[in-house]
Curated annotation (Swiss-Prot):
GO terms for biological process: methylation; negative regulation of protein-containing complex assembly; regulation of apoptotic process; regulation of glucose metabolic process; regulation of mitotic cell cycle spindle assembly checkpoint. This is Leucine carboxyl methyltransferase 1. It comes from the Eukaryota. It catalyses: [phosphatase 2A protein]-C-terminal L-leucine + S-adenosyl-L-methionine = [phosphatase 2A protein]-C-terminal L-leucine methyl ester + S-adenosyl-L-homocysteine. Methylates the carboxyl group of the C-terminal leucine residue of protein phosphatase 2A catalytic subunits to form alpha-leucine ester residues. GO terms for cellular component: cytosol. SUPFAM superfamilies: S-adenosyl-L-methionine-dependent methyltransferases. It comes from Rattus norvegicus (Rat). S-adenosyl-L-methionine binds at R71, G96, D120, D169, L170, E196. Keywords: Methyltransferase, S-adenosyl-L-methionine, Transferase.
């Protein structure tokens, strides 16, 4: 939840585009380290992240750790609500997944969808696949669901019965669709698409095209988006300047003006319902016992900074179709 969040996905461009994307790719590393640290001090349970992400050499600030807790909790609640509504007869597309461990955690909980897809930069995918192949704790659960002799895996792609990891470019929708279909994406299944701090690194036109593609590709679908909001104020401008100093441009920041602008772009690009909440509101609505547990882990002397950070990130979700499943009823 820090001012430069995370995992984005666009790759095979010209060399100038690759240079522009370098800062964006770096946000994957930043977010992964923040999550690993928060897990290491007990904010949430994730036995897999330590096998994918090295431990940070520096301690992360308490407000950052609480922000990541709220992010992981909110996204997880929406994912599980979708899985319950569809009784897991669905598929999930995590676009810009980075070092995400959701596949393994859902398997442990008996909540795997028909198939779980991840898409990210080929460079990030290569690193993740190399780690998976060399860590039995990560590789074994995949093989338990798939006959070994038919597993497809190379440096940029893994395709198994229940899990696929794909290196692709979200700005090239024909390439994206082709690669997903090669891994048996089923457009007839209820589909959940997830982006976390991904759309903000695309131009408004590029992110609109992705949202339209998602809306028209699946009859029954839900879209979850986590990213910045309220970026017109002074605190938002400081966030933008900090990222620019790291060669990371928020190309889509104009869509992050308010919760209303976030919902509006979903509705304008083919989605039938749209909801949004800033992360301070979400955090404030957590069960008191859970908040007390989180706040007992570390002392925070500036509550105002936490509130400022939380008010500049939001969780949005949209649905299309699925009336018989009750998708419109889903909330965090």
């Amino acid at each position: 939840m820090a001012t430069g969040s995370r995992e984005s996905s666009f790759s095979s461009c010209a060399s100038s585009c690759d240079f522009d994307d370098e800062g964006v790719r770096g946000t994957c590393e930043d977010a992964s380290l923040c999550k690993r640290f928060a897990v290491s001090i007990g904010h949430w349970h994730d036995p897999y992240i330590e096998h994918l992400v090295r431990q940070s050499k520096e301690r992360k600030a308490p407000e950052i750790n609480r922000g990541y807790f709220a992010r992981v909790h909110g996204v997880s609640q929406l994912i599980k609500a979708f899985l319950r509504k569809t009784e897991c007869r669905c598929q999930i597309l995590n676009l810009g997944a980075g070092m995400d461990t959701t596949f393994w955690k859902l398997k442990d909980e008996g909540l795997l969808p028909n198939k779980y897809f991840e898409v990210d930069f080929p460079m990030i995918v290569t690193r993740k696949l190399h780690t998976i192949k060399n860590k039995p704790l990560l590789f074994r659960p995949i093989m338990e669901l798939h006959p070994e002799d038919t597993l497809q895996i190379d440096s940029h792609m893994l395709d198994s019965k229940r899990y696929a990891i794909i290196g692709a470019d979200l700005r090239d929708l024909s390439e994206l669709e082709e690669k997903l279909k090669k891994c048996n994406m089923n457009t007839q299944l209820p589909t959940l698409l997830i982006t976390e701090c991904v759309l903000v690194y695309m131009t408004p036109e590029q992110s609109a095209n992705l949202l339209k593609w998602a809306a028209r590709s699946f009859e029954t679908a839900m879209f979850i988006n986590y990213e910045q909001v309220n970026m017109d104020d002074r605190f938002g401008q400081i966030m933008i300047e900090n990222l620019r100093r790291r060669q990371c441009d928020l190309a889509g920041v104009e869509t992050c003006k308010s919760l209303e602008s976030q919902k509006e772009r979903l509705l304008l690009n083919g989605w039938e319902t749209a909801s949004a909440v800033n992360m301070m509101e979400l955090y404030s609505g957590l069960p008191r016992a859970e908040v007390n547990r989180i706040e007992s882990l570390e002392f925070l002397d500036e509550m105002e900074l936490l509130e400022q950070l939380m008010r500049h990130y939001c969780l949005c979700w949209a649905t299309r179709g699925g009336q018989e499943l009750g998708l419109k009823e889903i909330t965090y």
